[in-house]
């Protein structure tokens, strides 16, 4: 038999010890007689235990019955016969429908796969494991070496865990700690299900060795418990090889003392962080904290931070399965390469949802010196305001100051909202961030920040199962201010059920819509700008977010289909709605980009299958054509900004976004872009009766400037909002003089002629 077949068979064979969840086998461990899997009557666990209590784990010597009683299967009432079939014909010597011994590899594999197929038992998916790195290590010969076998072989992992050969490099490199294996490592095998799981499926216990400093002969073996919760849990098991911190809490790294830059309102400097050496402490991609730790010390502004890595929820039941399931193959050592096939993890690490964190890590590694210095530099690299302001700019988990933002700027808030939109507390009071360093129920703040992690959108990363908020009904709160005497009513918008894309809608609908302005009562039209917030593509898609001028129609043309992508109304575009249909039907689905771009921002390829499916033949899209439309869209917004500047309303891309042009030069000068100079006198442009229409033009500009894909999401809606806003703000009348309005900005030197030409090409000579 080939070695490959033997390995595959061994992987699946051992998983028989954990083969059934409720519903797979029908046998009850309490002894109720019935028909078990295989059609043979059952006799109950008591009869099995009578003979098999003396059978022991061949590597640890522990009773398999003792192991089984610690398992999830036992606690859920799935007994021996749930895997092995009814025992009425067995009696110690007779047949069992599904015995372990004497069966062919194909029979054993088929039996295990009946439950461990990624569907019935999604958290224990045998196919994912078989195709992952644990069953297929990069260097198979590492399993044959005495020291390396601790984490690169089945037997070595079990023997080492039992002997307390677990911890940082100081332990693993110390000959006194190394166990004497009862068999030659040359006979060791690659990892199987039973490397981590005992008979019945419970996690194996891991031990380490500790000693008291200065006390001779004080070394002793204790349970490996780096999250210090006195529970044998998944964090303990996984970090026994993928070590994050020592038993005393010291961060794993190169072993050097890191200097972490910090800055706050008082001043700036560095803070020292001691690391313990990992065994592989000279390559960043072999040291887990290089990507799985966020330094709370790294405050880069009074309120912002650098996010150096993912924060593990250490004390939850499945902290590693939050993202990995049994996949175990990330391929994140580099950004690309034929020898590193694409994975969801590779995509996410380069995406905006992931703060482009992996790009920062790979770039730091490329510039670093080799060895421990590489590990240090990569550990300190991270997402910043330059690449990920939505995650780094504020301390989003600070409930007192940012609770209302947590729904979309933290994974915790996003997951809680998507689980129960109607019951979600908008103040953030119901969000717990106890997995972040220093966050408690009393202070409710931490200097670590989250990105949008897998578990923010998914309930089960192993299967990709999404959270299910249902169709989103968004309540946009009314605008009220006692200081300006402003009152406003809530605006409620019910969006259609778009299946998996409902998850996206949870954060891409904006915080205010144009109708919020119309719902305001204000005595003098002097008030702060109503801000749509960022990336409101879902609202644009369904034509609900903009400020719509009276007498003008904003209904989609009959042939408009973008809001139907991913539904039965648009065959061939998927079943998960328009957001997923366009942004996730690409070879790099979790980059969330339907196109690729070069370094200049030009579109080089259209990768979304939805785009290609619909835009064929006469309506085929080309990268060049789409790039031109994007450029013209941006130009039209520049024209709108110029028209607003002509009325003394300057746009600057920082809250509150619109400022007074105090020197009437049409340029947002540094001294003008301060909050004390915010534009507030909307009635001063065309009178009190029209103040809402004036703010509406500014609202539409801000809305679409912050939707860079607005030219594609719903180009008809976007064009009409821009057209009407320019039309009105130019002379206070809706009279379709947009071409003249744009030309006037060129004459006034607020817009260059090339941009004006592109804007007119995008909007056309008549209202879209």
Curated annotation (Swiss-Prot):
Binds 12 heme c groups per subunit. GO terms for molecular function: electron transfer activity; metal ion binding; oxidoreductase activity. A lipid is attached at residue 24 (S-diacylglycerol cysteine). Heme c 11 binds at residues 579, 582-583. It is found in: Cell outer membrane. Heme c 8 binds at residues 405, 408-409. Heme c 1 binds at residues 48, 51-52. It is a lipid-anchor. This is C-type polyheme cytochrome OmcC. The gene is omcC.
């Amino acid at each position: 038999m080939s070695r490959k077949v033997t390995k595959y068979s061994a992987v699946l064979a051992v998983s028989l010890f954990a083969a059934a969840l409720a519903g797979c086998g029908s046998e009850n461990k309490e002894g109720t007689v019935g028909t078990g899997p295989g059609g043979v009557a059952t006799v109950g666990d008591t009869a099995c235990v009578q003979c098999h209590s003396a059978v022991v784990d061949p590597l640890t010597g522990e009773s398999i019955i003792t192991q089984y009683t610690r398992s999830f299967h036992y606690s859920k009432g799935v007994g021996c016969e749930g895997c092995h079939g009814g025992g009425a014909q067995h009696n110690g010597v007779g047949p069992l429908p599904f015995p372990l011994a004497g069966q062919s590899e194909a029979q054993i594999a088929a039996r295990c796969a009946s439950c461990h197929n990624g569907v019935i038992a999604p958290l224990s998916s045998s196919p994912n494991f078989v195709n992952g790195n644990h069953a297929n290590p990069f260097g198979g010969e590492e399993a044959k070496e005495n020291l390396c076998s601790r984490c690169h072989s089945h037997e070595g992992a079990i023997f080492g865990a039992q002997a307390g050969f677990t911890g940082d490099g100081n332990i693993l490199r110390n000959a006194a700690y190394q166990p004497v294996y009862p068999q030659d490592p040359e006979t060791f095998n690659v990892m199987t299900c039973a490397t981590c799981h005992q008979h019945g499926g419970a996690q194996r216990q891991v031990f380490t060795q500790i000693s008291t400093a200065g006390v001779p002969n004080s070394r002793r073996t204790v349970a490996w418990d780096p999250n210090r919760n006195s529970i044998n849990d998944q964090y303990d098991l996984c970090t026994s090889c993928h070590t994050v911190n020592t038993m005393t809490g010291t961060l794993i790294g190169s072993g050097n003392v890191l200097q972490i830059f910090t800055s706050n309102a008082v001043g700036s400097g560095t803070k020292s962080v001691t690391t313990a050496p990992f065994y592989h402490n000279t390559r960043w991609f072999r040291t887990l904290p290089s990507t799985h730790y966020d330094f709370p010390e790294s405050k880069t502004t009074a309120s912002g931070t650098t996010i150096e890595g993912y924060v593990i929820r250490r004390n939850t039941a499945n902290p590693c399965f939050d993202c990995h399931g049994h996949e175990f193959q990330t391929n994140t050592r580099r950004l690309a390469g034929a020898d590193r096939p694409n994975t969801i993890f590779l995509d996410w690490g380069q995406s905006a949802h992931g703060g482009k964190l992996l790009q920062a890590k790979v770039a730091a590694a490329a510039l670093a010196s080799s060895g421990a210095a590489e590990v240090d530099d990569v550990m300190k690299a991270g997402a910043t305001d330059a690449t990920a302001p939505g995650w780094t700019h504020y301390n989003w988990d600070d409930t007192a100051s940012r609770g209302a933002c947590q729904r979309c700027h933290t994974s915790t808030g996003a997951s809680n909202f998507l689980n129960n939109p109607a019951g979600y507390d908008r103040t953030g009071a119901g969000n717990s961030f106890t997995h972040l360093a220093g966050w408690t129920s009393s202070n409710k703040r931490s200097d670590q920040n989250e990105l949008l992690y897998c578990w923010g959108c998914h309930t089960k990363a192993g299967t990709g199962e999404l959270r299910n908020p249902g169709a989103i009904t968004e309540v946009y709160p009314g605008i009220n201010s006692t200081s300006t005497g402003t009152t406003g009513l809530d605006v409620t918008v019910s969006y259609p059920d778009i299946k998996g894309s409902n998850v996206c809608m949870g954060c891409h609908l904006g915080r205010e819509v144009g109708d919020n302005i119309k719902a305001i009562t204000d005595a003098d039209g002097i008030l702060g700008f109503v801000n749509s917030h960022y990336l409101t593509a879902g609202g644009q898609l369904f034509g609900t977010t903009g400020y719509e001028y009276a007498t003008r129609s904003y209904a989609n043309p009959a042939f408009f289909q973008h809001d139907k992508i991913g539904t039965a109304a648009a065959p061939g575009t998927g079943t998960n709605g328009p957001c997923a249909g366009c942004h996730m039907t690409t070879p790099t689905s979790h980059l969330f980009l339907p196109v690729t771009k070069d370094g200049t921002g030009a579109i080089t390829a259209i990768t979304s299958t939805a785009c290609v499916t619909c835009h064929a033949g006469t309506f085929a899209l080309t990268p060049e054509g789409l790039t031109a439309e994007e450029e013209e869209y941006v130009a039209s917004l520049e024209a709108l900004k110029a028209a607003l500047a002509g009325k003394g309303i300057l746009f600057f891309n920082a809250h509150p976004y619109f400022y007074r042009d105090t020197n009437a030069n049409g340029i947002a000068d540094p001294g003008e872009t301060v909050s004390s100079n915010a534009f507030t006198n909307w009635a001063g442009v065309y009178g009190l009766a029209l103040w809402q229409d004036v703010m509406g033009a500014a609202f539409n500009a801000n809305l679409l400037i912050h939707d860079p894909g607005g030219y594609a999401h719903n180009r008809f809606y976007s064009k009409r909002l821009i057209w009407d806003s320019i039309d009105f703000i130019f002379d206070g009348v809706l009279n379709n003089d947009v071409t003249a309005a744009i030309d006037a900005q060129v004459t006034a030197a607020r817009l260059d002629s090339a941009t004006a030409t592109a804007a007119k090409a995008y909007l056309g000579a008549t209202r879209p």
